[in-house]
């Protein structure tokens, strides 16, 4: 007896780890947020540019963890010409390639902004995704401290444009030269210690997440996390670890009455590391930057020097900065959430120079759009309600052309509208359920009787949803029920829909 053919197995629909789907409400919120950021960046004179998601791997450089495989830390593949290409892990390295390739045609300094998705081939976890959105601005071709100061000021202005009040954010400023000076002083300067220094910097960069004890472990032999995974440390000796921790413990703010950046920098110069020329040069850079920001009206409540700011990427060469949210809020389950850093950047004078073989100074700032959006949504600065859907024109019978004409008329008037394209035999109730799921403000109804009379029925779906709460108040219920559906002549349809949308505060962004 012949075997029955096996039924083909259904493919399992599943989302890859570390990635997320996004619906209309979240996309609309992103659009609103990006527009506010764009307005600030353009006010500062930056212009847009786009680069592709893929770059040659060697163009991106090994600025994420240096591993044996070229696709460690980034998503990479070999092209048909056997060259490695990778998905960008940030928006800065691709910009460096773009500027180098178009150097002679671009104005210098070159001021640009761009936003888009970036990708990290890292272990995903709560709040850590493999794909996320960034919004960057960069000035290439200027080594002036004013360019770095401008990034800090623009970061502060952007936070306020997004509805985050002063006192609820802080732009923190440091200098890689200060950290490099400390590392030189403890004996790990020079090219032969590049990898070890990078491990130290990345350990310090995790201070807000792991605390001093976790950083100490990463400065030493290493640290095992809650899942049991072991991260190899920098292998510093006890004395070297003590010196690094001394710097991190020295905030310089505890006994300062006026909260002065100048006073803090004076205190830093009192540390024994100040005899190091690199350390001293870093202090002088910060003095110039803070002089500019303070003269422009940005006090220490908005921009403040902080020696714990590192930035984890290797390519930074000078001033570095981060934007921290000082908001304590709760997630949807009532658990406390502290968002910390939502953006940062710094000076990267060597990134474009790799392609040019000549010095090309550059500085930039990046906002983590995905992370900041989550924070703004939780504090109520970004709506998470779905945007109003289109006006739905319902259908009766097989004649579609007349209904489609109504849709076209609404669209020509600038009203979002769609024809119900489900089963034409569906009842009016089924079509209304569809309109509700689409979050439609109203629906247009025209059966055979209405068609003969040259009228349409307009059903106010927003008011209809409110009627459910009025069932106990019969008089009010009957009054609003009469308002929830009304008729008008066909040639009055557009005007009546516009009145309803205005009355209900419906505006499509």
Curated annotation (Swiss-Prot):
CC terms in the record's Gene Ontology section: cytoplasm
Pfam families: HGTP_anticodon, tRNA-synt_His
Catalysed reaction equations from the record: tRNA(His) + L-histidine + ATP = L-histidyl-tRNA(His) + AMP + diphosphate + H(+)
Compartments (UniProt record): Cytoplasm
Keyword annotations of the record: Aminoacyl-tRNA synthetase, ATP-binding, Cytoplasm, Ligase, Nucleotide-binding, Protein biosynthesis
Annotated GO biological process: histidyl-tRNA aminoacylation
EC number: 6.1.1.21
Gene Ontology molecular function terms on file: ATP binding; histidine-tRNA ligase activity
Domain of life: Bacteria
Quaternary structure and partners: Homodimer.
Family designation: Belongs to the class-II aminoacyl-tRNA synthetase family.
Protein known as: Histidine--tRNA ligase
Upper classification of the organism: Bacteria, Pseudomonadati, Pseudomonadota, Alphaproteobacteria, Hyphomicrobiales
């Amino acid at each position: 007896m012949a075997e029955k053919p096996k039924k083909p197995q259904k493919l399992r629909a599943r989302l890859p780890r570390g990635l997320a789907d996004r619906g209309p409400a979240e996309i609309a919120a992103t659009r609103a947020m990006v527009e506010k950021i764009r307005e600030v960046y353009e006010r500062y004179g930056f212009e847009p540019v786009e680069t592709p998601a893929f770059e040659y791997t060697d163009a991106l450089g090994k600025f994420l963890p240096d591993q044996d495989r070229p696709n460690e830390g980034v998503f990479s593949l070999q092209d048909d010409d056997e060259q490695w290409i990778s998905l960008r892990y940030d928006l800065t390295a691709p910009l460096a390639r773009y500027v180098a390739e178009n150097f002679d045609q671009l104005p210098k300094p070159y001021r640009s902004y761009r936003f888009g998705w970036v990708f990290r081939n890292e272990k995903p976890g709560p709040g850590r995704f493999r794909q996320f959105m960034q919004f960057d601005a960069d000035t290439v071709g200027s080594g002036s401290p004013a360019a770095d100061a401008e990034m800090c000021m623009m970061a502060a202005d952007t936070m306020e444009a997004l509805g985050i009040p002063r006192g609820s954010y802080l732009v923190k400023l440091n200098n890689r030269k200060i950290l490099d000076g400390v590392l030189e002083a403890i004996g790990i300067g020079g090219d032969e210690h590049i990898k070890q220094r990078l491990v130290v910097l990345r350990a310090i960069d995790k201070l807000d997440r792991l605390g001093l004890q976790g950083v100490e472990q990463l400065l030493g032999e290493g640290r095992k996390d809650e899942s049991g995974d072991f991260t190899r440390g920098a292998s510093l000796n006890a004395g070297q670890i003590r010196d690094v921790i001394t710097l991190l413990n020295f905030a310089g703010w505890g006994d300062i009455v006026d909260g002065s950046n100048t006073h803090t920098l004076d205190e830093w110069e009192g540390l024994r590391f100040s005899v190091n020329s690199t350390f001293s040069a870093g202090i002088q850079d910060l003095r110039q930057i803070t002089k500019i920001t303070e003269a422009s009206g940005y006090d220490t409540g908005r921009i403040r020097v902080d020696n714990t700011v590192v930035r984890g990427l290797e390519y930074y060469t000078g001033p570095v900065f981060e934007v921290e949210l000082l908001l304590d809020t709760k997630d949807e389950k009532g658990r406390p959430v502290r968002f910390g850093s939502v953006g940062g950047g710094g000076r990267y004078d060597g990134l474009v120079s790799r392609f040019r073989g000549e010095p090309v100074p550059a500085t930039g700032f990046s906002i983590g759009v995905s992370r900041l959006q989550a924070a703004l949504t939780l504090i109520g600065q970004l709506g998470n309600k779905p945007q109003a859907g289109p006006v739905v024109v319902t259908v009766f019978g097989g004649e579609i052309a007349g209904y489609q004409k109504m849709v076209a008329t609404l669209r020509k008037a600038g009203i979002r509208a769609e024809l119900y394209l489900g089963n034409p035999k569906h009842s009016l109730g089924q079509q209304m359920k569809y309109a509700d799921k689409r979050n439609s403000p109203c629906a247009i109804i025209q059966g055979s009787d209405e068609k003969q009379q040259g009228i349409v029925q307009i059903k106010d779906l927003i008011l209809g949803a409110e009627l459910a709460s009025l069932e106990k108040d019969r008089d009010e219920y009957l009054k609003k029920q009469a308002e929830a559906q009304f008729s008008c002549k066909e040639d009055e349809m557009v005007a009546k829909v516009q009145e309803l949308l205005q009355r209900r505060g419906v505006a499509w962004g």
